[in-house]
């Protein structure tokens, strides 16, 4: 059994969101209210509140991993509710598209964050970053262990930032350098073993 500790990268995206918001409201399009997703939203919240204690996180659940029309409707509702950071835990880039259109068409100061893959091309002007997986490193480690005879069954592998299993997607072109530097410095601190694997929950 193996998995990536996505909450680590979510915490970092939360810091970026907390630094970027002007309304102190982050809107999340949630896939399913299951433990993994709730944990990730909690990590986002903790990251944002670590730099901005006035943060409020609002979630609309669409009960789907991929449903672009529902995703779009939820993102628009969150935007109308005063959330100026749109975040998603689904596999659709709809929140990125909504943020881009709201800024270009209506001049709204709204930003977006992606999920699981680089989504910035879907709305480059208003994209911050997002959490993404690097499964190739996990598979390489397992294959190497089999090849060298060191693979062991019946174990649980939890891999995170230090093992490059989770990461941040490329920063958006309009994200202030101060925000990027702050988040990257905290990430480096994590990689240097100054935080344990279960931070911020430990």
Region roles according to the model:
Residues 1-202:
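A residue-level marker of the well-folded mature domains of exported/periplasmic proteins
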């Amino acid at each position: 059994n193996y998995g990536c500790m996505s909450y680590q990268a979510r915490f970092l995206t939360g810091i970026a969101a907390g630094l970027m918001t002007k309304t102190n409201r982050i809107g999340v399009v949630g896939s399913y209210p299951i433990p993994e997703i709730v944990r990730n939203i909690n990590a986002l919240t903790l990251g944002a509140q670590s730099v901005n204690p006035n943060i409020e996180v609002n979630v609309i659940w669409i009960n789907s991993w991929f449903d672009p029309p529902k995703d779009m409707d939820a993102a628009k509702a969150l935007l109308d509710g005063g959330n100026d950071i749109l975040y998603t835990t689904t596999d659709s880039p709809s929140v990125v598209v909504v943020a881009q259109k709201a800024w270009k068409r209506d001049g709204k100061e709204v930003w977006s964050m992606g999920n699981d893959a680089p989504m910035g091309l879907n709305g480059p002007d208003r994209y911050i970053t997002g959490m993404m997986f690097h499964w190739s490193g996990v598979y390489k480690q397992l294959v190497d262990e089999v090849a060298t005879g060191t693979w062991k069954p019946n174990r649980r592998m939890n891999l995170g930032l230090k093992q490059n299993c989770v990461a941040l997607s490329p920063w958006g072109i309009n994200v202030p350098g101060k925000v990027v530097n702050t988040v990257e410095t905290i990430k480096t601190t994590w990689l240097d073993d100054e935080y344990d694997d279960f931070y911020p929950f430990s």
